[in-house]
Amino acid sequence: FPRAAHPDLDARAWAAAQHPALSGDGPLLLLPGRGTRLKGHREAIALLARLRATGMDARLWMPGTREAGRGPYVAALEAEAQSGGVADALVIAPPITEIARAYAASDLVLQLSRKPEAFGRTVIEALSVGRPVVGWAHGGVGELLAELQPPGAVPAFDEDRLFDTVKAMLAHPPPPLATMHAYTLRAMQDATLALYHDLADDRRLAIDP
């Protein structure tokens, strides 16, 4: 999918055809990730409830959460959504293979992992499709957002700032990045190999000055 300033209409129709709860004229939030509490699903559901309480017809899609062995966790999330009045605006789905299409369908991507991640692949994938990202400013996610899209970085676990940041970004989405060349697979492989060569050269100099 090309980088675009707005969700892809065909991708949005595809998402709604699979999950009617994702239909509607309001914004679609995407939180991809495994079915574990470390991924921030509860915070995303609470965010959805606050957004909808303002009158916004927001929807939340969480692909990857519904996995084998995660039944009790998913049931707890569904109960929270029900008590928060957002069960009909939430889709807790199994992993999907067409994740780029899911990014393209969304208005905004969330990265709310409670445990700092070493890299934060979701940030790169979403920005590569032109979708804005909001996430906790820690670990690799925080570093990538600070470099590539600073307005999306939120102090870790500050749910009030999360709410304000998401509202602002939905109202005024940042323009897609002109290029992501530094984060293509080839570019990152080349950078890693260059680092290995430098380390090997330093080691040779230390052994044979």
Residue spans for each PLM region:
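Short hydrophobic beta-strand element within catalytic cores of glycosyltransferases
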Residues: 132-135
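Nucleotide-activated donor-binding/catalytic signature segment of Leloir-type glycosyltransferases, i.e.
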Residues: 74-94
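Conserved donor-binding/catalytic core segment of Leloir-type glycosyltransferases
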Residues: 21-39, 45-48, 61
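Acidic donor-binding loop of glycosyltransferase active sites
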Residues: 104-118
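Short alpha-helical donor nucleotide-sugar binding micro-motif in glycosyltransferases
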Residues: 95-96, 102-106, 121
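Conserved acidic donor-binding segment of nucleotide-sugar-dependent glycosyltransferases
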Residues: 147-160, 167-172
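Glycosyltransferase donor-sugar binding loop
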Residues: 32, 59-75
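A charged, aromatic-enriched C-terminal amphipathic alpha-helix characteristic of glycosyltransferases
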Residues: 171-205
